């Protein structure tokens, strides 16, 4: 029997706004459920219950049909987001189906859970959460996950969202722990509800400049990439972009 995957929204095509695939044209499949509760989460609706009535239990075939209904042939890449998609064993069926249709996939996770299907994903971002999130990193699990993916030859990067200098120090720790893995710093968005796109963009550019300055003055970050949250600069806090 086909697995049922809890999906809260499917949208696109749009532009990937984060990490090593920033700027990539992609579709999004956003799953429900997370094992974290980050204080600044911009998709808390996937786990806090406020949109539980919108969750649809869908098979891989149903998700694929919805992607095609939404975008036709106007995509070749699908980002599976959350929540934490790594809670869902059944996503392996979707990954395999997309691969059969020559569609590349991307997944982002905090590195707290493992599923064997992850090695079949084309673009993998592990984003351990810094102190400002209120969460604690299980480094044993993170070490195991990075080790498995590195051994499998997966295309992998690490990304840390930075809100303050404590987060930046945490990012140094992560980068030092995994020096051979591509490493990305991303400025955090402290205002996830403002409807004023221009004001938000101005504030985020200032934060981005601040993060660039920190990085340029930190020899521990000589190999780091510093990125904005691109979709927020372009569209503000708008959903489904």
Predicted regions span which residues?
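Conserved residues at beta->alpha junctions
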Residues: 32, 82, 162
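Conserved beta-strand segments that form the floor/walls of ligand-binding pockets within enzyme
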Residues: 6, 28-30, 42, 79, ...
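Conserved Radical SAM active-site core
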Residues: 8-9, 15, 25, 37-122
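Generic signature of intrinsically disordered, low-complexity segments enriched in small/polar residues
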Residues: 14, 31, 43, 48-50, ...
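Flexible, acidic/Gly-rich N-terminal and inter-domain linker regions that tether
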Residues: 1-32, 36-40, 44, 218-219, ...
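Conserved AdoMet/S-adenosylmethionine-binding subsite of the radical SAM
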Residues: 75, 86-241
């Amino acid at each position: 029997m086909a697995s049922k995957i809890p999906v809260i929204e499917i949208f696109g095509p749009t532009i990937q706004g984060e990490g090593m695939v920033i700027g990539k044209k992609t579709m999004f499949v956003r799953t429900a459920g997370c094992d974290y509760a980050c204080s600044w989460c911009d998709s808390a609706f996937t786990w806090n219950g406020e949109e539980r009535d919108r969750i649809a239990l869908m098979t891989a075939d149903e998700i694929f049909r919805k992607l095609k209904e939404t975008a036709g042939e106007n995509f070749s890449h699908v980002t599976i987001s959350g929540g934490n998609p790594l809670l869902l064993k059944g996503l392996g069926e979707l990954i395999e189906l997309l691969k059969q249709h020559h569609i590349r996939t991307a997944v982002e996770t905090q590195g707290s859970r493992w599923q064997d299907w992850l090695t079949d994903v084309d673009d993998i971002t592990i984003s351990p959460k810094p102190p400002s999130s209120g969460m604690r990193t299980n480094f044993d699990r993170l070490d195991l996950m990075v080790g498995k993916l590195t051994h499998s030859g997966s295309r992998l990067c690490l990304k840390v969202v930075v809100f303050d200098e404590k987060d930046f120090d945490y990012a140094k720790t992560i980068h030092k722990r995994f020096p051979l893995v591509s490493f990305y710093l991303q400025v955090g968005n402290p205002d996830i509800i403002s409807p004023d796109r221009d004001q938000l963009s101005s504030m985020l550019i200032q934060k981005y400049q601040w993060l660039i300055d920190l990085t340029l003055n930190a020899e521990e970050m000589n190999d780091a990439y510093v990125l904005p949250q691109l979709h927020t600069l372009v569209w503000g806090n708008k959903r489904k972009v």
